[in-house]
Amino acid sequence: MVNWTKEQEEAIYTSGSDILVAAAAGSGKTAVLVERIIQKLLAEHNPTNIDALLVVTFTNAAAQEMRNRVGAALEQALAANPSSIHLKKQLSLLQRASISTLHSFCLDIVKKNAYILDIDPSFRIADDMEMDLLKQEVLDDLLEEWYGDSNPNQDSFFEVVNRFTSDRSDAEMEELIRSLHTFAMQSPWPNQWLDKLVQTYNIPEEWTEEELPWMNVLRDEVSRQLDAVSQEIDIAYSITQEADGPYHYAKTIEEEKAIIQEALKNMESWKYLQQSMLQVKFGKLSGKKVDCDEEKKTKVKKLRDSYKKRFQKMQEVWFARNLDAHVYDMRVLAPVIKHLVELVKQFQDSFAKVKKEKAVVDFSDLEHYCLQILIDESSTEEEVIPSTVAMQLQRQFTEVLVDEYQDTNMVQETILQLISDRQGSGNMFMVGDVKQSIYRFRHAEPSLFIDKYKRFSNSDDPSIRIDLARNFRSRENVLLGANYIFRQLFDEDLGEISYDDAAELIYGNKMYDDHPLEAKPELLLIDNNSEDVEQSDNEETVEDLEKAQIEARAYAKQIKNWIGTPEDEIPMQVVDKATGKQRDLQYKDIVILMRSMTWASTIADELQQQGIPTYADLSTGYFEAIEIKVMLSFLKVIDNPRQDIPLASILRSPIIGLEEDQLASIRLADRKASFYEAVQRYLQNEQDNSDTVKSLIRFMEMLNDFRQSARQGSLSELIWDIYRETGYYDFVGAIPGGKQRQANLRALYDRARGYESTSFRGLYRFLRFIERMEERGKDLGAARALSEQEDVVRIMTIHKSKGLEFPIVILGGMNKEFNQRDLSEKYLLHKDLGFASKYIDPVKRIQYPTLYYHAVRQAKFRDMLSEEIRVLYVALTRAKEKLLMVGTVPSIEKKLEKWQRIVDHPSWVLPAYFRMESKTYLDWVGPALLRHVGSEKIRTENIGNQVLESINQDPSDWQITMNHALDYMDMKDSSMDNDDNLKEKVFNWESVETEQEGLKNDVDARLSYEYAYKQATVFRAKQSVTELKRQQEVKDDYSDQQILPPSHGPIGKRPNFLQKKLKLSPAEKGTALHTVMQHLPMTHVLSEPEIEENIEKMVLEEKLTRMEADSINIRAVERFFHTEIASKIISGNDMHREVPFSIMLPASEVYANWKDQSNEKVLIQGVIDCLLQADTGWIILDYKTDFIEDNPTSQKEQELIHRYQTQMTLYRRAIEQIWKQPVEQTYLYFFSQQLLIEVPYRD
């Protein structure tokens, strides 16, 4: 019985209104959601039917897990109350219940209402590959049309091209249209969103600032910057007022503060604000010599330089040109933007038309089609009216439950609102955590959650907010550490939510109390400053190492300490979730989280060199893998052999294996022609039988065969033929990394099959698709060659780790800068502010950002930083027992100096300007921890009394460690060192002595070792009943003793492709007849037509092939139903068919020649055709398809009994030993003669 907390119970049982459950990390939100569903189904009064609930999950896996949990609860309830009709009904409805992703729900709605949309109801969902190909095809056709002379708007089109693309290719134009299309489709009203882009630039002649909504973003940002300037001025001024402060600076600073205050008064008007900002001139500080503290004097100067620089930057960037000039620039761009939008709409129409013709959709189409069905035709963007279908769904669903609500986008929100009850007080139950909303790149809209989060806590709103803050994942020290960090980072400015008492993580898993662990959350700082470092004997220097290598070695050192060694160190103990007890730490308990995977390959290599098994699921590197390069080159040559580089690479590859001098000789055969023609000329000229000629002849024959296959067969078959005929697949499996290399080759085959399952065909188009992916910088990622349970340290992105948990988390690359590349493009896109382009003059060849561009950039920048704080929250909350953050910095001293400027900030949350100017996670976490009482050792000055008392009293217990990169110089793989020493001695002709005197004797002993149980090596440890029966038949030493006698024919069932070409063997016919007897109904005497009908059904169900079905003697089967044994079966006795068993028997009983005195046992396996319940036990029936002569004599029957005596005896022993019930009789039934023989028991 689960002990739910008060808040969890409230979330499970509260009803009657819209409910938002703000569930912190590790708070058991999925369990609560499932329990709510179960309790609604099991309620004593007015229980809900499961088909009256719509449950929306984020992934298919989550939906299936939820369905399984609900099913298990229903089965348990039904076991306790087997007569409940309601529970039986719920179980029958479960598989059809609406528990799915929103995309699956949309698919169901669209399929059922396809007639409304006038689309083919048999449409299929295309994958990303096919959609990419379709988009490219449509763009190619449209660009050809737009560039054509018949285009009436050619001049307008060229205007767009000249402003937004280079003269090298149309790639930028294509990407621009793709981006605008993708962004538009994230709106419930895509065409209206595009129209608004044009409206933004169509500024009237007489305009006011109120008509420029994007100006509010800039005003807010200027206000924040001026507040930051004021704060720095206040700090500087307060220092001048101290007893030994630089008081002679006070007057200048005070005057500058007054100017800033004046500027803040003009925030309502940009014109007046600009005037006041540009009037500010910073004078020089007094040069008067006074007796004051030099440190304080320097600090005031640095503070003044900081706010002066901040202010001057605003003057230069935002106020250098007046607003009228910026508006004029936008008016100039207006017609260009208008035509660009027309191009995007034309692309959308053409793309939609092509998808309709091919009857394919993507996930975005599903959402928009669903929306079209649910929205009444009279709806507008301002007033959304539900359609008849939507109102039917509102009546059907008594509650709509949404998991991971923080990741919902506007289209999905509109769909959910249309099918939920808007007439009453609401019936939506939403679960999520906005602090974990990290999918803005997928257009997730955290503001939807935040709006409800604020509104539902208002007493005037009937809706309810429930906070689940109790964390059941992590140890208390991990939670306290996370709380300490995020109280200083989250607020409504950045992170978009305050980290108040309701948002804090509360320790909930008391299981850890029984297993204390000294493992503080830790920040490891690595100083990579190579200056003033003494030279060491080590040849490797700090400069030689990348940051990734340094950090990887730091990880390795920590991991080795945690794992321990068999000789001297005890492994760290972690609590096993399944048992609740402590166990040794394993590699798979450790994860290394990175913001991106750019370092992953280097880190994995370094860890593996240190003997630490590691796996990184890379999203890049697939096309760079040598085996993929070779295969793509081969495919290119098959497509067109007159491609010199691919052809040369294939000839040089292990597939053909020519050396450089051989390739040179071929080139000399014809220097001017293509390399393929040079190969042909070489073969014509060279009449000898050299290795080169043999290799080239073999290659040309192979190439001709493959080119023929490419014209006639499928692409995937061609690829597999290459693997098989060249042996390349086996070859790469035998070289280092073979498992991964083969996985990559299989992935190429799978991707080719996926390509062919689309509406596209052909080798050329497949290769062109791959080339375009490479041109756009896309990669497929190496194929996965690792199971989830393998004991390795995993490297993954923070995004991949969401929803997972690990005993130990290493968060690496803390000092890697945030990715801001998107903020410097020619154009920026924002869901609310639209499309902001730099002003581009193609004639003067100049471009510069407009004020509108600055506004959109600032909004995107703030959104990006808010997301980064949430990503950091996800990372820190993955840890169950130990959290280690690692950052490598060029100079710790300079970092500490920067961080210490704000440690005395008078509130918990770090200043907004400081957080916004931070470029790395370390620049957030570092100053936060520098305020911690545990950081006294690393502070460069005594600032303890300047920190807030509540911060000093915080219960978190952090460990801050500082190392130098030099500490990781001596961590080269020891085996490599030994190899290097050995090579050096051999090179210098020095004697090589072994370190162990007894090494020779040890080697001799191992080479002459004899296994103590020789006899066990020549007898099988596992036997089938059929094989034992064969050994009894053939009384010779060969069959009786050899463990693996040579095979004289195919073992087991032949593959389907062979079955289609050959006749069935007698054994295969027998197997087919056994399949028929296994699946035929035994409820009455079957006639021949009934038997034939059932066999056809088995073919349709793919239980039999057509050839197997045709081999069945239907007359023989029909005769079986007229036997005495069949009558017993039909009479209703308990009967089991195809009963598998395994039993252990002493080897001496199984093998007549067994002479060993050991207690060896043999595993016997078999399958009993039919078991029939008798009065006091069981009857065994075994079907035989042996051909026997007509009217067999009693002597012949005795021979048959003798042949199968061993088999039937083993069957009897198995049933009696396993089922603990006696076997009364054992029978053989021979179909060829309708003969039933009883086999007596032989002890």
UniProtKB/Swiss-Prot annotation:
Ranges where the UvrD-like helicase ATP-binding domain occurs: 2-475
Catalytic activity: Couples ATP hydrolysis with the unwinding of duplex DNA by translocating in the 3'-5' direction; ATP + H2O = ADP + phosphate + H(+)
GO terms under cellular component: cytosol; DNA helicase complex
InterPro entries noted in UniProt: AddA, DNA_helicase_UvrD-like_C, DNA_helicase_UvrD/REP, P-loop_NTPase, PDDEXK-like_dom_sf, PDDEXK_AddAB-type, Restrct_endonuc-II-like, UvrD-like_ATP-bd
Enzyme Commission number(s) of this protein: 3.1.-.-, 5.6.2.4
One Pfam family from the record: UvrD_C
Entry binding sites for ATP: 23-30
Family the entry assigns: Belongs to the helicase family. AddA subfamily.
Protein name per the record: ATP-dependent helicase/nuclease subunit A
Lineage, highest ranks first: Bacteria, Bacillati, Bacillota, Bacilli, Bacillales
Gene name of the encoded protein: addA
